Design a protein with these regions (language model features):
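Cyclophilin-like peptidyl-prolyl cis-trans isomerases
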Residues: 2-13, 18-241
């Protein structure tokens, strides 16, 4: 796979299923949550990926019954996520480890699909500079980056209601999750998300959905990639009990 941004196939998939996705009164719904290229294309983790304590391979899972709180501060406000290890032990262990080591700090929400999802977490091409913006080269590739490793899939045992936080992945490629994640904006997204792929569910937004909605309402490219034109960075990401 090339390093260029891969066109999401959400609306194409919906059409192939013989149905038109209707979310929030809009037909089409934009692109599905999609990760970057396979880890096999990267010989080492991106040098800008957080701190030296970040994992370089799939970290230990969270145990069933173990929960964590991930707090994301952005210029738009604060988003608090309750992560539940019982939903997806492998994915939650990975997400919490990346949040704790600083990987997500300075990384943007790069895709905005109104009425559907917002997506972020590309630490390879989605990390802002000192000016709070992406470089021109990164802006052209944001959303196509990868972590340097991928993690195994977890089974999905619940559904994608508004506020659900889940891992993005490459369409039709099992075990392709890395660092990118998305937040569901609308209950109506659930059926189409399940039809398209199983995306490991990390937990749910416990506070700050108004902030998520505000980010989703910002301008995007208006094409199936739904790239944020002025992507919002995660200025601080911390983990608590």
């Amino acid at each position: 796979m090339s390093s260029s941004r891969r066109r999401p196939d959400w609306s194409l998939r919906a059409l192939a299923l013989g149905a038109t996705l209707i979310v929030g009164g809009c037909a089409g719904g934009g692109g599905l949550p999609i990760g970057g290229g396979p880890a096999a294309q990267v010989t080492s983790p991106p040098s800008s990926a957080g701190t030296s304590t970040c994992p370089t391979a799939q970290p230990a899972p969270l145990a069933a019954g173990q929960t964590k709180t991930v707090t994301i501060v952005t210029p738009q406000g604060t988003i608090v996520i309750k992560v539940d290890g019982g939903l997806a032990p492998i994915a939650t262990g990975n997400f919490v480890a990346l949040a704790a080591c600083g990987y997500y700090t300075g990384v943007v929400f790069s895709r905005l699909v109104p009425g559907f999802v917002i997506q972020g977490g590309d630490g390879q091409y989605g990390r802002v500079g000192a000016d709070g913006k992406l470089s021109a080269s990164d802006a052209a590739r944001v959303g196509s980056g990868n972590l340097g490793y991928t993690i195994a899939d977890d089974p999905v045992t619940t559904t994608y209601v508004r506020g659900t936080v889940a891992m993005a992945r490459i369409a039709d490629q099992p075990n392709s999750q890395g660092s990118q994640f998305f937040i569901v904006l609308n209950d109506a997204a659930a059926q189409s998300l399940i039809q398209a792929n199983d995306y490991a569910i990390l937990g749910k937004v416990s506070a700050g959905m108004d902030v998520v909605d505000a980010i989703a309402a910002l301008p995007n490219s208006g094409d199936p990639d739904n790239v944020a034109l002025n992507p919002v960075p995660m200025t601080s990401v911390t983990v608590g009990p």
